[in-house]
Amino acid sequence: MLAGVLNHSIIKRFGRADNGDIYVFSPSYAKTMADKRQQTTLDAGVVRIKAGTEEFDPDYYYSIEAQTGGKSFIRCWHITGDYFLLLMYDRSLTETGFTANQLAIYKGETGKLTYVTGLPSADLISGFGNTPYVENGYAYMAVTTTEGYPSIYKIDPVGAVATKGVSIEATQISGVGKLQPQN
């Protein structure tokens, strides 16, 4: 059952690390509910199900908000090992006008979140591709800005560093991938 869910999430908020551990990311959207009975006081955070078990690890919880000054995220993707790429909001969900214009790397084993450097200034970013392309331990993400053409950035999860690659003469890039020849 869990394997099917891992492969069919509409908005990805969990993933399996290479060692089989499953990380579940909660953006804590319930903070924004109008009905007080539905609201939560819990931070956006991460819990884990260790490989070979079916229960949440009672000793594992890391607050995303504690590491970001109260910011949350909209989605996440597994890159390699226990590294995950998160699409981050620019402010707390309890504020108005928040937008997802930043990327961060989450390291499962340590629970550390690090913002990706090497990207254009967040105030210039108008969008990201729908899903990164992942190959050989790197994520490739389309980044659209309000100045110039969109570009593909190669993201090294270990250093949380993005390197600008090719720019495309277009207004937006929704995704990036690689074609393989069929035999």
Task: For each feature predicted by the language model, list its residue ranges.
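Repeated scaffold domains used in trafficking and secretory/extracellular systems
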Residues: 4-14, 66-80, 123-133, 168-182
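Hydrophobic, glycine-enriched assembly/anchoring segments
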Residues: 149-183
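Short, conserved, GDST-rich strand-edge loop motifs in beta-rich repeat architectures
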Residues: 24-43, 86-100, 144-145
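Long, internal scaffold/assembly segments composed of regular secondary structure
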Residues: 1-52
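C-terminal structural cap/anchor segments
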Residues: 66-127, 154-162
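Short coil/turn segments that connect the beta-strands within blades of beta-propeller domains
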Residues: 19-21, 80-83, 135-138
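Beta-propeller fold detector
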Residues: 1-2, 51, 56-66, 112-121, ...
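Beta-propeller blade signature
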Residues: 1, 37-54, 99-111, 152-160
